[in-house]
Regions:
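Alpha-helical ds-nucleic-acid-binding substructure associated with the helix-hairpin-helix region
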Residues: 1-71
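C-terminal accessory module of base-excision DNA glycosylases/AP lyases that mediates lesion recognition
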Residues: 62, 77-162
């Protein structure tokens, strides 16, 4: 999100034209790797010339969106799932390869370690159908809150002793 915030300081309304107009160095200065700069500029160019239609994705099924987006260099299943959840608002996406979701599941459910993409994580998502995107958001939030609590708890226990 730091990178996103740095880019938004340059322009509030992000567009393919905006990314195409930026120099690679400007994007690098915002924190993007050389490969991500190439991917972003390539995708922006594809959108501008009409070879990649983001608006048209909303008419496709979830799997069709993933297949279509994955044709773009630098976009895979995880990125496609994030687009489905956050841009298209699809309710039943279960991002089993997302580290935040897995950490949230482990913490909230007090489970043993799981690997991202594991069959156990995939199966666990079945109980949340057809609202797995919402469950994923809960696990992300839990994981984010846990980070804050783990930083604050030692300070609280020290102040109680004083």
């Amino acid at each position: 999100s730091r990178i996103f915030n740095r880019i938004q300081k340059l322009e509030k309304r992000l567009s393919p034209e905006f990314f195409s107009s930026l120099s690679a160095e400007t994007l690098r200065d915002a924190g993007l790797s050389y490969s991500k700069v190439g991917y972003i500029k390539g995708i922006a160019g594809e959108i501008i010339i009409g070879k990649f239609n983001l608006r048209g994705l909303s008419y496709l099924t979830d799997e069709e969106v993933i297949l279509e987006m994955s044709k773009q260099k630098g976009i895979g299943r995880w990125t496609s799932q994030m687009y489905l959840i956050f841009a298209l608002g699809r309710p039943d996406i279960w991002p089993i390869n997302d580290l935040g979701v897995v950490k949230g599941i482990i913490g909230l459910k007090k489970l043993e370690e799981f690997e991202t993409g594991s069959k156990e994580i995939s199966n666990l998502g079945d109980i949340y159908r057809p609202w797995r995107s919402i469950a994923a958001r809960v696990f992300w939030q839990y994981q984010n809150i846990s980070k804050v609590v783990s930083k604050v708890e030692p300070q609280l226990s020290n102040s109680v002793r004083d």
